[in-house]
Design a protein with these regions (language model features):
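N-terminal, post-signal-peptide segments of secreted/periplasmic proteins
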Residues: 2-254
Length: 254
């Protein structure tokens, strides 16, 4: 079944959620599965079969994640575009899901119904190999919103010297021969541990420009990484940024 099924009606808003690992698609408007975009978004149905964004690239670097894309929908209309990241092991094969909410931008279409965007989500990072998707929601102004689209098609993110640690586990079962290879092959748990991140950084030549390990560990409260043995000796320029964990408080203890 779909994560969120909109059987009919319009103006149904779906914002800032985490929707993934469903047997069907994350958001389904009507009963037809993925509804293809139509030029000018003139069709009707559940949530007016709102067109979804089309993403063209996503890259994480030291400052954040830059995403490019377009939206074709109703002319001269404002939309909230929300971005989501998914681990490769849980992403749908085609249109995306919404495991981790990254942030949003606001765009306004022109007289032909087109909007393009090149935006950087500051201090928000994804791993190489993550699947990125997006939704579009009509922005009515004043904090009010209308119909939300289905998730757009996945694109695969790249990263420039960024690794996101997303588990407190000390397991090392991923491919650590490089940062890119670790993103593509994360092992049985589908996650990246601090041990794996350091090993992959060590095996990725950076010419003295530091790679950066950041954290995004699910759940609240104190995250404790208990290591069973000494972590790898760092042999490349590397920053380990404990302050990057979204719910950190006070100072990280290392």
């Amino acid at each position: 079944a779909a994560g969120v099924y909109v059987s009919g009606g319009t103006g149904i808003t779906i914002l800032g959620n985490s929707i993934y690992s469903n047997t069907g698609q994350a958001i389904d408007l009507g009963t037809s599965g993925v509804t293809a975009n139509d030029a000018g978004d003139a069709d009707s149905g559940a949530n007016n079969l709102q067109n979804f964004p089309v993403l063209t690239s996503a890259n994480s670097n030291a400052t954040g994640t830059t995403i490019d894309g377009t939206l074709n929908s109703n002319a001269n209309t404002t939309y909230r575009i929300e971005f989501f990241a998914n681990r490769p092991s849980i992403a749908d094969a085609t249109n995306g899901e919404g495991e981790r909410y990254l942030g949003f931008i606001t765009v306004t279409t022109d007289g032909s119904g087109n909007a393009s965007y090149n935006t950087t989500l500051a201090n928000v990072w994804v791993n190489s190999g993550d699947k990125i998707s997006a939704t579009a929601t009509v922005d009515l102004g004043g904090g009010n919103y209308g119909s939300t689209s289905e998730f757009g098609a996945n694109i695969t993110a790249s990263s420039t010297g960024i690794i996101v640690v997303d588990t407190t586990s000390d397991v090392s079962d991923g491919t650590t021969s490089s940062i890119t290879n670790l993103g593509a092959a994360r092992g049985a748990d589908g996650r990246i541990s601090l041990r794996e991140a350091i090993a992959a950084a060590n095996n990725t030549a950076n010419g003295g420009t530091p790679d950066k390990i950041v954290f995004n560990i699910a759940g609240s409260g104190t995250h404790v990484i208990n290591v069973a043995s000494a972590l790898p000796t760092i042999n490349q320029a590397l920053i380990i940024d404990g302050l990057s964990e979204p719910d950190y408080a006070a100072a990280p203890i290392v």
